[in-house]
Amino acid sequence: MGYYALTETTAIQYAKEHGYFEKKANVFCHEIGDGNLNYVFKLDDGEKSIIIKQALPYAKVVGESWPLSIKRATIESKALKIFAKYVPDYVPVVHSHDEELAVTVIEDLSRLTITRKGLIDGEEYPLLSQHIGRFLANVLFYTSDFGLQSEEKRGLEGTFVNPDLCKITEDLVFTDPFGHYDTNDYEPELQLAVDELWSDKTLKLKVAQYKYKFLTRKEALIHGDLHTGSIFSSPSETKVIDPEFATYGPFGFDLGQFIANLLLNALSREEEQRSVLFFHIEKTWSYFVDTFTKLWIGEGVEAYTKEKQWLPIILQNIFTDVVGFAGCELIRRTIGLAHVADLDEIANKEKRIQAKKQALYLGKELIKYESKNADIQLFRTLFQQTVSGGVKA
């Protein structure tokens, strides 16, 4: 029959035909997706529920003028299964995948909340940083040359060649926000700050270097889009979803994106409400380093993991990349395509513009920062300098 886009009615038919519900069951279905690329249906018969996710052959956020390969659904399904191999507690269960229809049937996580929404609403997730730090350390280590035999790693690199989605990252994270491109989207009040950003040659040179790292460093399997909208949370659970951007890339990319989105949420808050975000930023890195170190010592397969001086160099290189990638994400989410609600939903216009100017300034400072001795406190330090340094609406 070939590919066709599901509707709520045909999603129910699909689920029944594949044995997820009895033929006579009274199944309710709602399209719940709020993302930019896919349909997401929740199906429930009162006793059990599932999620059906279908990739569209174009970007939903733009329309059919932006075609995309539906093979990204297969990449997402395979990535979730690899994540589950190493950290099953932190990803949803994949029930099945239909490559022809680009349909994946996965566990319903309705008991949890999208982390971005929860943070905006002031909810607290005490285990978020522990879970994300451990998730990233395990996935990145075990899919890298340090935890995987080189021939197996090269095979995985081929599995996760993801040209359409990587091109989106190349353009929307590293290129378009730093110049005159039609995809950019920002308020007129930001024009002066944007002009200053676009004319900063030092900044552009640094961004070029980070883009080149993304293009060329095939260090480990990365999620590729790990923002707080790609995570479900509760006070006791964390589940990473939507790895359709998965590819082999730099160790520090996912960490940088995650931390940047915590910073964006911090910018939307009053000063007395920000400490929990910096707790999560610092603890994410701490849990990542501790877990990665234990795996390096106990599970390393590469000969030079036995050299004690090698690991600190690797971790410092990762941290340098985390800082720069976080800066790129801050700028992209402020003036590029696909904003975040953390900033866009600030009700007071003056405060919203001020927060966005601060995001641009902080992003520039992170990208341009150079020090071989920096530690995770850098994010708190530069943030405080930004919000107290006179960046006004």
Curated annotation (Swiss-Prot):
Residues that coordinate or bind ATP: N38, K53, E107, D108, L109, D242, P243, E244
Entry keywords, A to Z: Amino-acid biosynthesis, ATP-binding, Kinase, Methionine biosynthesis, Nucleotide-binding, Transferase
Identify the InterPro entries for this entry: Aminoglycoside_PTrfase, Kinase-like_dom_sf, Methylthioribose_kinase
| Reactions catalysed according to its record | 5-(methylsulfanyl)-D-ribose + ATP = 5-(methylsulfanyl)-alpha-D-ribose 1-phosphate + ADP + H(+)
Superkingdom? Bacteria
Binding locations of substrate: D225, R332
Keyword Transferase on entry:
yes
Q: What is this protein called?
A: Methylthioribose kinase
Q: In which pathway does it act?
A: Amino-acid biosynthesis; L-methionine biosynthesis via salvage pathway; S-methyl-5-thio-alpha-D-ribose 1-phosphate from S-methyl-5'-thioadenosine (hydrolase route): step 2/2
What's the EC number here? 2.7.1.100
The molecular function GO annotations come to: ATP binding; S-methyl-5-thioribose kinase activity
What Pfam families has UniProt attached to this entry? APH
Function text? Catalyzes the phosphorylation of methylthioribose into methylthioribose-1-phosphate.
**Quaternary structure and partners:** Homodimer.
* The gene coding this protein: mtnK
Q: Does the keyword Kinase apply?
A: yes
Task: Name the protein family.
Answer: Belongs to the methylthioribose kinase family.
The Gene Ontology biological process annotation of the record reads:
L-methionine salvage from methylthioadenosine
